[in-house]
Amino acid sequence: MAEVKVYYDRAGNTLTVWFGNPQDECICEETGDEVVLMKDKSGRVIGFEKLNFLATSSQPMRVAFEAVDVGKP
């Protein structure tokens, strides 16, 4: 099973999600919507970072993950 890593930086107000190996990061591309895409050397997106992300509570953040079957045409 693939691994997804989620990091929240309270000091930097960023939420970072990796679904590839962070060590494979070669280039970052800002989308203009306060989102930075992290890509490997082949240009494949392996993660993203949401800038100016503020948690609304001091409680630990819960992360829900759900697999969705989009079906085949």
Where is each model-derived feature located?
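Small, basic N-terminal interaction modules of short regulatory proteins
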Residues: 1-73
